[in-house]
Amino acid sequence: MAGYPLPIKHLISELGKLPGIGEKTATRLAMHILRAPEGDARALADSILEVRDKIRFCRVCYNFSEAELCTVCRDSARDSSQICVVEDPDALMAIEDSGSYSGTYHVLHGVLSPLDGIGPEQLKLRELVERIRESGVREVILATNPNVSGDSTALLISRMIGPLAVTVTRIAQGVPMGSDLRYMDRMTLSKSLEFRRGMEKEP
């Protein structure tokens, strides 16, 4: 990268900060942007700025939204007695794409990961408990990924809401251990929701 002008180096460096993008891929993307028509390059830059300026968290479920409430929370046809707890908006969209769920969601924006410095305070857990207390929720479906961090987070949530009068369920173990909900096919995801199992709550 030593021979590139400084603006190109900066672009490669910024692209390289994206997940899964190494220096070679970042360089290839930078070259593509440089060779693209000016209108395309500006449209890309404008889209990035638009996302940063216009997207916020839904005040109810913490999904991404352009408005105070996301499209799911604005939909009066959704079953508000169910909350499906997911790690991130990507998992929410995967479940929506499966067409197998008609309730509401709560997005944690992460899972417990002590090595990464992520504890309960960094997740939307307190907001979840408050939401359950203040609404007529009857079932909380824990749809964190089936791995150590996801299972630990699900267990903590089940303990936190133990004193509340709600049923707590976990997506079925037909979902392979260590897999990611974002990349599952629709049928597998649909079945994991259909055959979800109850979790014991601590008083």
From Swiss-Prot:
> Where does the secretion signal sit in this chain?
none
InterPro entries in the record: DNA_Rcmb_RecR (IPR000093), Rcmb_RecR (IPR023627), Rcmb_RecR_Znf (IPR015967), TOPRIM_dom (IPR006171), TOPRIM_RecR (IPR034137)
Q: Which GO terms describe its molecular function?
A: DNA binding; zinc ion binding
SMART domains noted in UniProt: TOPRIM
Question: GO terms for biological process?
Answer: DNA recombination; DNA repair
Q: Which Pfam families match?
A: RecR_C, RecR_HhH, RecR_ZnF, Toprim_4
- ZnF (C4-type) spans are 58-73
Which residue ranges does the record assign to the Toprim domain? 81-176
Q: Which UniProt keywords apply?
A: DNA damage, DNA recombination, DNA repair, Metal-binding, Zinc, Zinc-finger
> What is the annotated role of this protein in its UniProt record?
May play a role in DNA repair. It seems to be involved in an RecBC-independent recombinational process of DNA repair. It may act with RecF and RecO.
The record's similarity note reads: Belongs to the RecR family.
Q: Name the chain's protein.
A: Recombination protein RecR
The record lists the organism as Syntrophus aciditrophicus (strain SB)
Q: What is the lineage of its organism?
A: Bacteria, Pseudomonadati, Thermodesulfobacteriota, Syntrophia, Syntrophales
Q: Which gene codes for it?
A: recR
